[in-house]
């Protein structure tokens, strides 16, 4: 399954819950999705709090999936082709230099 198919699947899920409806309690606005994305990303940090290794890979995978799904939905509602944006960003990153020494 590719990014577009995953996005379509996510949109079907959101539609089935009524979250695209006008009076929903979970409006799929860029603001709300950005907040949700950030909150889910923060949950990933919990897996590394006070340790360097993953102790529950299945739980981490679930949190990563949450982040990915919110990212797909945010790109969808803002009309951004996420696959294209990611490929463009990879090309930009190939030309960048990073200082690998810690300061």
Give short role names for the model-derived ranges.
Residues 1-64, 68-103:
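Flexible "arm" and connector segments at domain edges
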């Amino acid at each position: 399954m590719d990014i577009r198919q995953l996005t379509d699947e996510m949109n079907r899920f959101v539609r089935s819950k009524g979250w695209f409806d006008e009076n929903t309690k979970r409006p799929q606005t860029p603001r709300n999705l950005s907040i949700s994305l950030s909150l889910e990303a923060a949950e990933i940090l919990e897996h590394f709090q006070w340790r360097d290794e993953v102790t529950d890979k299945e739980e981490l995978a679930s949190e990563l999936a949450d982040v990915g799904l919110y990212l797909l939905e945010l790109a969808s509602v803002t009309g951004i082709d996420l696959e294209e944006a990611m490929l463009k960003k990879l090309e930009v990153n190939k030309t960048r230099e990073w200082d690998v020494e810690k300061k």
